């Protein structure tokens, strides 16, 4: 993982280009991420930043975390996340500094990770896009049933990973190579092209595109 930011998904809108074409964008609010720890090759074997996001009452922070925050002289956050760094990335930053939206620029492509909406228990038609069975011709109870899930005596079991009904959503998902359309430094907003995983108000993690990093090597 490369350097990134933790933000809050606000919702979707659209913006118009000079030629009049419409671009759907997701608005992400990035409250400044506070660096709580800097990991180095000498002490930890790799370079990374640990950042705190959001705010939390000091009464709700346990003693080990409270000491961790006070050592870095930063306010307690809702969550701690770690971003691994390259050899040349943000070499001057230190604990207590803030990371803001200006570490990204317009036109840059990023990967965004978020928790998808939970949709509860779902059947195979909704969950795995199975086709339905015949509406008539003797079928009266199995219109949305999955059908056979295995063979006979051999192998005598259902294979692991078989697509069946179950919990849908509420899993982490990463969308790759999403373009940043606009960076609003004054309001701490990123406008990212397309849809991002999760419900409005959910946490999203924005990092540099992994595919772009491979191309640059």
Curated annotation (Swiss-Prot):
Protein name as it appears in the record: Large ribosomal subunit protein uL3
N5-methylglutamine modified-residue sites: 153
PTMs per UniProt: Methylated by PrmB.
Keyword line: Methylation, Ribonucleoprotein, Ribosomal protein, RNA-binding, rRNA-binding
Any one cellular-component term (Gene Ontology): cytosolic large ribosomal subunit
Gene3D superfamilies according to UniProt: 3.30.160.810, Translation factors
Pfam families given in the database record: Ribosomal_L3 (PF00297)
Summary of the function given for this chain in its UniProt record: One of the primary rRNA binding proteins, it binds directly near the 3'-end of the 23S rRNA, where it nucleates assembly of the 50S subunit.
PROSITE patterns for this protein: RIBOSOMAL_L3
UniProt-annotated stretches for the region Disordered: 135-154
HAMAP family per the UniProt record, alphabetical: Ribosomal_uL3_B (MF_01325_B)
GO molecular function terms noted in the UniProt entry: rRNA binding; structural constituent of ribosome
Subunit structure, as described in the record: Part of the 50S ribosomal subunit. Forms a cluster with proteins L14 and L19.
InterPro entries assigned to the protein according to its UniProt record, in alphabetical order: Ribosomal_uL3, Ribosomal_uL3_bac/org-type, Ribosomal_uL3_CS, Transl_B-barrel_sf
Single Gene Ontology BP annotation: translation
Similarity-based family: Belongs to the universal ribosomal protein uL3 family.
Superkingdom of origin organism: Bacteria
